Amino acid sequence: MKELLYYTFIETEVTGAFLVFREKTQNLVFASLGNDKLFLLGKVEGFLKKHEKQDTMYDLQELKEAETYKKSIENYTICLENKMPLPSGAIPFEFLFGTDFQRKVWNELLNVEHGHVVTYGDIAKRIGKPTAARSVGRACGSNNLALLVPCHRIVGSNRKLTGYKWSCKLKEQLLNNEKENSLSLSRL
């Protein structure tokens, strides 16, 4: 069986983003950050090939008619520019891949609020695996829904920035933007 996925690329002052939507559900299934469109396309093609199931192949096509996905694309742009925290459900998404453990971690990351950080150990405790901080870190590194699953809000036990799939510099910028916007929103 073939399943159709559509991709598009957006650019912002912060960085670019490569977005992939599943036609069947119209949900976002992949969001990667960076400014090199061809590099990101190659990454997603490799990722899909690696994760093809025996009965499912993925056909990746450029999104030509964006109307169906327009609101999700606009909301992702707002999210990327950190203009404001988005309400839950503003961008419908789903985990197309991932182990049970990874999905458990990713679902817990959804509870980390805009403008806040927690440690890998905190997440491990929250999912009932208090000694699994490193495994939580690996699950964060496997996250393919940048920003929506906010792995950028997770820091080391010493509260310092640690690795980020899309660069520690970008992680720092995203956190600083969120912090500034949270302070601005609290003054309203």
UniProtKB/Swiss-Prot annotation:
Q: Catalyzes what?
A: a 6-O-methyl-2'-deoxyguanosine in DNA + L-cysteinyl-[protein] = S-methyl-L-cysteinyl-[protein] + a 2'-deoxyguanosine in DNA; a 4-O-methyl-thymidine in DNA + L-cysteinyl-[protein] = a thymidine in DNA + S-methyl-L-cysteinyl-[protein]
Primary site of residence: nucleus
Keywords per UniProt: DNA damage, DNA repair, DNA-binding, Methyltransferase, Nucleus, Transferase
Q: Which InterPro entries match?
A: MethylDNA_cys_MeTrfase_AS, MethylDNA_cys_MeTrfase_DNA-bd, MethylDNA_cys_MeTrfase_DNAb, WH-like_DNA-bd_sf
Q: Where does DNA bind?
A: Y120, G121, R134, S157
Location of this chain's protein in the cell: Nucleus
Please name the catalytic residues of this protein: C151 (nucleophile)
The record's listing under SUPFAM superfamilies reads: Methylated DNA-protein cysteine methyltransferase, C-terminal domain (SSF46767)
Q: Which GO terms describe its cellular component?
A: nucleus; peroxisome
Give the enzyme's EC designation.
2.1.1.63
**Chain's role:** Involved in the cellular defense against the biological effects of O6-methylguanine (O6-MeG) and O4-methylthymine (O4-MeT) in DNA. Repairs the methylated nucleobase in DNA by stoichiometrically transferring the methyl group to a cysteine residue in the enzyme. This is a suicide reaction: the enzyme is irreversibly inactivated. Prefers double-stranded DNA over single-stranded DNA as substrate.
Leftover remarks = Present with 150 molecules/cell in log phase YPD medium, but not detectable in stationary phase cells. This enzyme catalyzes only one turnover and therefore is not strictly catalytic. According to one definition, an enzyme is a biocatalyst that acts repeatedly and over many reaction cycles.
Similarity field: Belongs to the MGMT family.
Q: What is this protein called?
A: Methylated-DNA--protein-cysteine methyltransferase
Q: Which organism is it from?
A: Saccharomyces cerevisiae (strain ATCC 204508 / S288c) (Baker's yeast)
